Amino acid sequence: MLFRSLATLGHEVLALQSAAPDRATYLQRPDLGRQLSAASRQALDARLPPADPGTPDTPEQRLHDLAIVVADGLSALATGRHALPFLQTLLPGLRADGWRLAPIALVRQGRVAVADEVGQRLRARQVLILIGERPGLSSPDSLGLYLTWMPRPGRTDAERNCISNVRPAGLSHADAATRLRRLMDEAARRQLTGVDLKDETPPALGGGAGSAAFLLARD
């Protein structure tokens, strides 16, 4: 159902799977949720062969400015409710400004770091993952946004920026998109993300509880 919803954005959507084949494995083996399955790797490589290992991996060699990943994480309810309206808010501005966007990747049983592999295989300078956060008693549908510059396996949480608690009762889709776009523009300018990249958005724009420029991954 989410795949069909995302397809209404007018952007190609890829259905992928982490190396965790089911929910039980996902919960017991967090490492597998951070990797793509062999079939998903093959599917991406068939579309876009890996870069020549003899060529330096620089931002200039990447083919896309941004890859977007949507993963269920610990709350499929969050992505089911908020991924589409959030992207409906974010994407028009990116398209208008000429951002080169990779296909949207919908990853089942995915954790935050799976975006690093997706972003690298799609040759994107930045990767954004929308992921369901650990549910709380008052927030069963909280969506987290994680942004990483020059994604590749092995990136650490300190190299990401996070905006959390994206939901109507927390940080609105519009305010989250504003914060994220500022971070994305600054990441492109400075060629980095993480602890050295601060969210300079004025507090009046979405200063709701749970929003932050950097957080440890809560997947």
Segments (PLM) and residue ranges:
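Solvent-exposed alpha-helices and their adjacent loops that cap or buttress functional pockets
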Residues: L6-T8, D52-R62, G119-R123, L137-S139, ...
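Gly/Ser/Thr-rich loops at beta-strand to alpha-helix junctions
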Residues: D22, G73-A78, G110-R111, R134-L137
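Short, charged beta->alpha transition segments
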Residues: L27, L32-Q61
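C-terminal functional extensions of proteins
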Residues: E133-D219
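Glycine-rich phosphate/diphosphate-binding loop of Rossmann-like nucleotide-binding domains
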Residues: A76-G98
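Short glycine-rich or small-residue beta-strand-to-loop segments that form or flank ligand, phosphate
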Residues: D65-A78, L128-L130, S164
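A contiguous pocket-lining binding segment that forms or flanks enzyme active sites
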Residues: P92-P140
